[in-house]
Swiss-Prot record:
Catalytic activity: K(+)(in) = K(+)(out)
Reported regulation of activity: Inhibited by ATP via mitoK(ATP) channel.
The gene coding this protein: Ccdc51
Mitochondrial intermembrane side: 220-382
Gene Ontology terms describing biological process: cell volume homeostasis; mitochondrial potassium ion transmembrane transport; potassium ion transmembrane transport
Mitochondrial matrix side: 36-198, 404-406
Organism: Mus musculus (Mouse)
Protein name: Mitochondrial potassium channel
GO molecular function annotation: mitochondrial ATP-gated potassium channel activity
Length: 406
């Protein structure tokens, strides 16, 4: 591919796109490089994006649930650790762990003592056998010297084993003392935790009793206020109805008086008409006009009387309803008064007498009953408070004796 004519040569370079080399007539090379570029990212369709999101939803849900569970577990563990630290369970658990470790060390020391004792006993047995043989051998025999030397070595070994045994016993005693101290510390921590729990339970019970007393006092006060409101309404009701009845009765009496005067005038006109007989037409027309005016006035008075009568009927119905309500109120008040004055409860089914409504005795009875209810509510509150205080004071010595014995 060499020569004077232009030739195109394709050369392959590692990691580089193909290079086109052109050789000219003068021998110079002109390099032309063709670069290859990747196509741009294609835009995703909305359907594809939605489908991908749908496929990723389960994984997102699992990740979210795992995160929520992890956070909930960490939060619960943190609060539980705080509770254990507040109550003292951490100290008790740590003391129990120390007891377990001390027990393990003590058991190891006991094993060493057992091994040392067994070795010492075996050595003493061997020494006894050697001494028995030495006693049976004559002093002139050559074996006597060997047995004496063996006895000497065994005595030295026995001394070493005895020292090791004594050291093991001392170590066992030390480990046992540490184990006993750990057990005492654990018992002390457990007793402290129990006392702390009892104290907090006592404080909680006292606070609960105080909250109960305060709640009962508040409820009694609210009920007393409601009873006061009902009594005030009951007191206002008869007074307003009595005023309305008085006004309607006065207007009715005035209407009756006007009607009687009108009737008297009519009678006088009739008698005058009969006495005069037949008269002039002018006089007859004047009397006719007077009669028409009087008839219109009479009709108006009759219509007004009917309205007044209907109003009085309505007021009478309201008064009957109020009497029933007052009788029910009186029954309720008598039932409320029954615990304070037993044996004085009478029938309350009947309606109240009209003299109470006329002379205002119902209002006085209601006010008196209001005072009695207020005094009874105050007595109940004071008695409940005294009972709670006495119970607390009576419980204190028992709790002190219980804590002292424990």
């Amino acid at each position: 591919m060499t020569g004077c004519s232009p030739v195109f040569a394709m050369q392959h370079v590692v990691g580089v796109p193909r290079i086109l080399v052109r050789r000219t007539f003068l021998g110079t090379d002109v390099t032309m490089t063709r670069t290859l570029c990747s196509p741009g990212p294609r835009e995703k369709r909305p359907e594809a994006a939605a489908l991908g999101l749908f496929h990723r939803l389960p994984e997102l849900g699992r990740t979210l649930s795992h995160t929520v569970r992890h956070q909930a577990a960490s939060t619960a563990k943190a609060w539980w650790d705080r509770y254990e630290e507040f109550v003292g369970l951490n100290e008790v658990r740590e003391a129990q762990g120390n007891v377990t470790e001390a027990e393990k060390v003590f058991m190891v020391a006991r094993g060493l003592v057992r091994e040392a004792r067994e070795g010492l006993e075996a050595q003493q047995t061997k020494l006894k056998e050697v001494r028995d043989r030495l006693d049976r051998v004559s002093r002139e025999d050559n074996q006597y010297l060997e047995l004496a030397t063996l006895e000497h070595r065994m005595l030295q070994e026995e001394k070493r084993l005895r020292i090791a045994y004594l050291r093991a016993e001392d170590s066992e005693r030390e480990k046992f003392s540490l184990f006993s101290a750990a057990v005492r510390e654990s018992h002390e921590k457990e007793r402290t935790r129990a006392e702390r729990t009892k104290n907090w339970s006592l404080i909680g019970s006292v606070l609960g009793a105080l909250i109960g007393v305060a709640g009962s006092t508040y409820v009694n006060r609210v009920r007393l206020q409601e009873l006061k409101a009902l009594l005030l309404e009951a007191q206002k009701g008869p007074a307003s109805l009595q005023e309305a009845i008085r006004e309607q009765a006065s207007s009715y009496s005035l209407q009756q008086k006007d009607l009687q005067d009108l009737m008297m005038d009519l009678r006088g006109l009739v008698h005058a008409e009969q006495g005069q007989g037949s008269g002039s037409p002018t006089g007859s027309s004047t009397r006719g006009k007077d009669i028409d005016g009087l008839s219109a006035t009479m009709k108006e008075q009759l219509r007004h009387s009917r309205q007044v009568y209907s109003c009085l009927e309505g007021l009478r119905e309201q008064l009957d309803g109020l009497e029933k309500t007052c009788s029910q109120m009186a029954g309720v008040l008598q039932l409320a008064q029954a615990p304070a004055h037993p044996g004085t409860v009478g029938p309350v089914d009947g309606a109240l007498p009209s003299s109470l409504l006329e002379h205002g005795s119902v209002i006085l009875a209601l006010s008196e009953m209001e005072q009695r209810l207020e005094a009874q509510a105050n007595r109940n509150t004071v008695s409940s408070t005294l009972v709670t205080c006495v119970t607390f004071l009576a419980t204190l010595p028992l709790l002190y004796m219980l804590f002292k014995t424990s």
